[in-house]
Structures are given as C-alpha cells and as structure tokens.
Amino acid sequence: MSAWVLPDHIADVLPSEARHIEELRRGLLDTARSYGYELVMPPLLEHLESLLTGTGEALDLQTFKLVDQLSGRSLGLRADTTQQVARIDAHLLNRQGVARLCYCGPVLHTRPDRPHATREPLQFGAEIYGHPGIEADIEAVLLSLECLRSAHAQEVSVDLADVRIVRSLLAGLPVGMHQLAQVHGALAAKDASELASLTRDFPSASREGLLALLQLYGDATVLNEAENLLKPFPGAREALSDLRAIAARMDGVRVTFDLADLRGYAYYSGARFAIYAQGASDALVRGGRYDEVGAVFGRNRPAAGFSLDVKQLVGVVSAPSLRAAIRAPWGDGGALSAAIATLRRQGETVVCVLPGHGSEVDEFHCDRELVLVDGNWVVKAI
C-alpha cells in the first residue's frame, strides 16, 4: 500500500476548506463567548473509565482504545467531549452557581456516524451547568440557532422531542431491558403492529398512550392532541409544557415535534432537539437536557447543551469570499520590509513573490501590488 494512503473516512483538509473551517470555528467560539460561555480544552487522550463511565454501549463501541506505556492502564481517544466537560465542571471548577462552558476540538470515531462522514469530526459544543429550569434549555436552543446564523446556514428548522414522555408512560411497569429495547425499536420504526404486540400486557392507559405516540409528529397541533391523550401522566404533561415553552421562543424558525423520537433515550433526561438546514442530509446540531451526566463524577448537576461537527457544517454553508491580497516583491531592503510590515499590521494580506516564481500565490487573489514610485513603496491596483 502506498505510504500516502490514509485510513478509510480519514482525510487531509486542504487550504481552501481549512480556511473555511477555521473561520467557522472562530465565529462559533465568538458567538458562544457573546453569550457568556467560557472556553475549555479537554485532552484528546484520557483514562478509558473516565471517558466511558455512564455513557452506554454506543460510545464504548465508537472509542479507540490503547494501553498507556507509562502506567499500563487502558486509555481512550475521546469520541465525544461532553463527558470530559462534565468532569471539568464537577471537579476542576467546582462552582456552586451556573457555569457556561464551550469547546471546539477533534474527536475520533471507530466507525463513521453516517455514510460518507469523517471519523475525525471537529466537535464544537456549549453546555450550561447548574440550572434545572426551562431557561437553560431555551438558552441552549437559542445559542445553537445563533451559531448556525453566524455560519450563514439556510432554511433552518428545529425538531423537538422529550424522553420524559415515554418514561412517564413506562413508569412503574415491569419492563426488562430486552423488552424496553424492543419497545424503543418499534417506536423508532413507527411499527404499530409490533408495538401493540409488545405492549399487550401493559395497562390500557400506558398501551394506548404509547400507540398514540406513533401519530404524534408534526407542527404545534401535535402538542394539543398529546395533552388530551396523555392526561393521566403528569410527567408527560410537564414535558409537553416545556416543549411548548421552548418552541415559543423560536421566532422565524420552522419547528416540528416527534414525540416518539427516542434518540439518546439513555443519555438525555428531558427535552432534546435536532436542528436541520438546507443541504444537510442529517441534523447539523443535536442537544438537549442531560442532568445525569455529572453523576459519575460525584456531582449530579443539572445540565443542558448541544454539539455540532464543524466539518459537517462546512459542507452545507458557503465560504465567505477571500479578501483580496497585495502582491509584493521579495527583498531585504529596510523601506520595503517596513512597508510590508505596516500593511500587515493594518490587516492586509501581503504575499511576497519569491524570485523566479512570478505571481504564484496559490488561492490568494491579488488585486493590488506594492511598487516603488519616486523612492516610496506604494500600493497600486493591478
């Protein structure tokens, strides 16, 4: 095999795309900072138990594992950053009030999340710890929408769900893990006959409620129907109220609901959301409330947040035009060097043309040049 061949679903990022990714990264972090979020940088490599404790089998299968040559302990290359940020909040910051944290860095997956996806996403995320109220959920959604606006994503829409609805319907029932997985599968596939078979021994209210969920997807009228159908279940009513409050804050955005959507059921503890945009075959952003995320670190704080893959985002938003550069001759003269330095300090891109290479400036378009006129270096249009 040729030495330059990379592993499947791993790729080099070339200049034009790298520039776009970096501009998006800066814009996303600046947007998070404008909301009061502080940047943290967890390590790419960590003890395996710290990365996987409480995360479930899915993340375990996605994590590359190796042995530490210093200690002999098992290490993992992070497949998701949320658990690390929860550890930082619980032990390193240990704040009593609200903590707003954001991050942006690579993660590694043993398998791609979807067809043609990279196994090395650049994950950006923001999380708010310490507030159990709906305000934190709303802020997470609003910040994620603002992040997509800053990236110029088009035709953005939000899909909302809440795991508390199904949990409320199943509360107190003697449902084993295997049967629970089957029920989840039937709900995800919207398979009414399979769900009816699986729930035939359930109390009628729970059975009818679960079957009703298969039809409860669409616009806000879904919430009205659900409130009528799920009256016997206080947990479901609370979840519906929260979904209505979240949706009310999203002006100018198409909002849909799918009350049978159970993605992240073992991870989320309340409302969850997925955000789509023109050109994306899958959700660009996923987030919600995950109050149990810090429990394994001895500090079970309320938490809400979201994450996205900047490399996925770059594929669906247009790159801003590159600011035209200035072409300058190569030289070591004091006046020339001073003129170039002054222009660069002013924010200009100045490309010095090396001897024998004419106007080779790669992706930079030069619409001006630095020329010597009457003993002074001046910028002129080309």
Curated annotation (Swiss-Prot):
UniProt KW S-adenosyl-L-methionine keyword: no
Single GO BP term: histidyl-tRNA aminoacylation
GO cellular component: cytoplasm
Annotated NCBIfam families: PRK12292.1-1, PRK12421.1
Job description of the protein: Required for the first step of histidine biosynthesis. May allow the feedback regulation of ATP phosphoribosyltransferase activity by histidine.
Protein family (similarity comment): Belongs to the class-II aminoacyl-tRNA synthetase family. HisZ subfamily.
Note: This function is generally fulfilled by the C-terminal part of HisG, which is missing in some bacteria such as this one.
Name of this protein: ATP phosphoribosyltransferase regulatory subunit
